[in-house]
Amino acid sequence: LRIVQAFIAAGVPKQAFASLPSSHAGAEEILRRCGRGMVFGDTGSTAKWLTDSRIEVHGPGYSKVVLGPDASANFEKHIDTIVASIAENSGRSCVNASGVWVTSHAKEISRAIAERLAQIVPRLEDDPLAQLAPFANTRAAEYFSGAVDGGLAEGGAEDVTATVRPGKRLVVFEGSTYLLPTVVRCDSPAHALANREFLFPFASVVEVKPEELPEILGPSLAVALITDDEELKTRFLTRSSAHRLNLGAIPTPHIGWDQPHEGNLFEHLYSRRAIQFQKAS
């Protein structure tokens, strides 16, 4: 809707636009019939469009905060940045961090994050302290929570938030369903939960060797690299696949509107052409 309003503000007639709320099946039918389209979602909903040149695919993000050796050793100074990366916008954006990759102190870091995130609880929607968004579809919340539990059941991972707060992850408040923030510490970057994202504040904490960075991260939309190690920064600048790289204590959701990390909408909707004009007479 913001894109539509921007077009209208630029002078395009309102009659040129339509808002068509629909199911997933309805959305797919719209994409099949349109000349150009954009789709946002997880791998399940976007994979089928990857080879269709008409459709611009966005998602999943797998965004991450990475602490270099110096920052991992002094992690207490960076908890605010990590928490903001995970929890802003109720953790529902593709630029929210779903992973915190560190080079040491994974156990201590995961607990510090969990203790902070455990303070985020459901509140009334007009409460200025409200940070969690409810789920309109209870089944979706149940599915996401079940996916986390399924990954934990495989072993090699611990739900750290479960050790610092009472009760379950899925709760009902004032008739609405919520998923409470969850931090999982994985023993290996190969664990099923090490590179997952969900529509609530969720993050896995993974410890790796400094020399494995950045290649071991895998695809990442946004990465906040916190370190004063210039050699590590250079490796990320030259070898990272991240679309947005924040160097320093900059939360992953903080973006510069003059630096679109996924291109410009104009490039998808229009063909670029240079035209010069002069009257013949």
Task: Indicate where each model-derived feature is located.
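A short acidic, amphipathic alpha-helical/loop segment
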Residues: 29-30, 48-52, 235-236
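Conserved C-terminal structural/oligomerization subdomain of aldehyde/semialdehyde dehydrogenase
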Residues: 4, 11-14, 33, 79, ...
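Glycine-rich phosphate/diphosphate-binding loop of Rossmann-like nucleotide-binding domains
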Residues: 1
